[in-house]
Swiss-Prot record:
The keyword Nuclease does not apply. It comes from Pan paniscus (Pygmy chimpanzee). Belongs to the krueppel C2H2-type zinc-finger protein family. InterPro entries: SCAN-C2H2_zinc_finger, SCAN_dom, SCAN_sf, Znf_C2H2_sf, Znf_C2H2_type. Gene3D superfamilies: Classic Zinc Finger, DNA breaking-rejoining enzymes. Sumoylated. This is Zinc finger protein 24. Transcription factor required for myelination of differentiated oligodendrocytes. Required for the conversion of oligodendrocytes from the premyelinating to the myelinating state. In the developing central nervous system (CNS), involved in the maintenance in the progenitor stage by promoting the cell cycle. Specifically binds to the 5'-TCAT-3' DNA sequence. Has transcription repressor activity in vitro. SUPFAM superfamilies: beta-beta-alpha zinc fingers, Retrovirus capsid dimerization domain-like.
């Protein structure tokens, strides 16, 4: 198994020992009714995502011989795609969905996987909904604040979101703005990674909240040099999606006039205006706007930590926690101080560092 495949799959769910036992022992010797060779009931199997990951990570050394290897791969693939319950079209969609998520920028991979889409169309809706939420800087402050709360609930865990300073919440939103901006930028690039006149189209201007040369202490998210200050588009080959001119956005929000191609995206968007949070936690009563956020929140009560580091085995309740942890192993430091160039693996460390710069400035002012 290559290092690249490990990195790509490392943010996915890693099965617990109990789940691994279910994966390897997919046939019961005897079911409760005494029938030998009975399969595990489909509604009692773990998440198909677990089997998809095991199928992709399976190594030849994991089996005693070639025949056993093929047999185990076949069984893992069956448990992932579930031909007994899925149609051919549904199986095709699962394979397409896997590849689509794999070609997304890493930030968007996490975002899409956290929303658990069941097919490619649902994944596209998740991305279009994100773009629409981040795409209108002229909205009222109260509405933008509500949007930010929804985004933060999606990006960080419940325990992480509580008590975060405003600057940290801004950083979470900015990460998504970079990814959303990349979608717009690549949409207008030619084969050389530039627009026709070599400049960014109006839609692709740097989001003001993340222009590192305007906001002291803001994050440098590791954007390639050619992409700084709105000079050019991203190089070709990372993520391209062309607009389908025949596909009209027929769903319109009565509150703000935004258009959506999917009714489900409009429903999610309207909750920003209404403040509706239909998904309530039975343990503590806290409500959320999306079911995926409720699933993440419930891990606070259950203690479930499905995201496991392949390097050291440490487990986390959220993808975002695992991604931050993995930087300890990779040495990646994407958060850069624009004042002195020092880099950090965690955004919180950068904010503490930036505070030291600000304190030094205050001392100089007092001395003067």
């Amino acid at each position: 198994m290559s290092a690249q495949s490990v990195e790509e799959d490392s943010i996915l769910i890693i099965p617990t020992p109990d789940e691994e036992e279910k994966i390897l022992r997919v046939k019961l010797e005897e079911d409760p009714d005494g029938e030998e060779g009975s399969s595990i009931p489909w509604n009692h199997l773990p998440d198909p995502e677990i089997f998809r990951q095991r199928f992709r990570q399976f190594g030849y050394q994991d089996s005693p011989g070639p025949r056993e290897a093929v047999s185990q791969l076949r069984e893992l693939c069956r448990l992932w795609l579930r031909p007994e319950t899925h149609t051919k079209e549904q199986i095709l969609e699962l394979v397409v969905l896997e590849q689509f998520v794999a070609i997304l920028p890493k930030e968007l991979q996490t975002w899409v996987r956290d929303h658990h889409p069941e097919n490619g169309e649902e994944a596209v809706t998740v991305l279009e909904d994100l773009e629409s939420e981040l795409d209108d800087p002229g909205q009222p402050v109260s509405l933008r604040r509500r949007k930010r709360e929804v985004l933060v609930e999606d990006m960080v865990s419940q325990e992480e979101a509580q008590g975060l300073p405003s600057s940290e919440l801004d950083a979470v939103e900015n990460q998504l703005k970079w990814a959303s901006w990349e979608l717009h930028s690549l949409r207008h690039c030619d084969d050389d990674g530039r627009t026709e006149n070599g400049a960014l189209a109006p839609k692709q201007e740097l989001p003001s909240a993340v222009e590192s040369h305007e906001v002291p202490g803001t994050l440098n998210m590791g954007v390639p040099q050619i992409f700084k200050y709105g000079e050019t588009c991203f190089p070709k080959g990372r993520f391209e999606r062309k607009r389908n001119p025949s596909r009209k956005k027929q769903h319109i929000c009565d509150e703000c006039g935004k258009h959506f191609s999917q009714g489900s995206a409009l429903i999610l968007h309207q909750r920003i205006h209404s403040g509706e949070k239909p998904y309530g936690c039975v343990e503590c009563g806290k409500a959320f706007s999306r079911s995926s956020i409720l699933v993440q929140h419930q891990r606070v009560h259950t203690g479930e930590k499905p995201y496991k580091c392949l390097e050291c085995g440490k487990a986390f309740s959220q993808n975002s926690g695992l991604i931050n942890h993995q930087r300890i192993h990779t040495g990646e430091k994407p958060y850069e101080c624009v004042q002195c160039g020092k880099s950090y693996s965690q955004s919180s460390n950068l904010f503490r560092h930036x505070x030291x710069h600000n304190a030094x400035k205050l001392l100089n002012v007092v001395k003067v």
